[in-house]
Amino acid sequence: MTKKFLLTIFIFLSFITKSLSSEFIGVIGVAVGDINNQKNEKLINGSKVFFGDTLYVKSKSNAQILFLDETVMTVGENTELTIDDFVYDPKTNDGNFVTNIKSGTVKFITGKISKKNPDNLEVKMPAGTLGARGTEFLVSSNSDKESTVLLLGPGPDNTLGMIPGNVQLSDGINMTDITKPG
């Protein structure tokens, strides 16, 4: 009886994991050069991006990804990133977005998830974790645990009346707020 029950639970969880990993979460808006996913499928303009995908943007290549919550990710050459979590409710703009940049350069323009709840967008890098607070920023990371973070979008002294954003960088021990562009 116990073995049958455990087998049933295992099969059920396998189906849930399979359905989550095939959840459409965004689209490649622009693809230039050699861009593949973990299945070694070539990604082109209009290719769908799914929960759990790992994207590989090769040398002399770049891509722009548009997510359902209107987050825009511009991915530079020699970048590897994984979408660890993406949950979005378009009715309430609630959700969670976690990406892991193993190497390369990615520019973010945060979307509705971060605007509704800034703590719900997280970027993992070899050097630590970054939380975005409704802004535009760039992350450049290498596999040697070095990362550069640049705040691009409206800082506290902007003259356009825009709500200032910031990013928060943590290495697991220390936390730093980046509040001014540059």
Predicted regions and their residues:
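N-terminal secretory signal peptides that target proteins for export/translocation
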Residues: M1-T2
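Sec/Tat signal peptide C-region and signal peptidase I cleavage site
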Residues: T17-S21
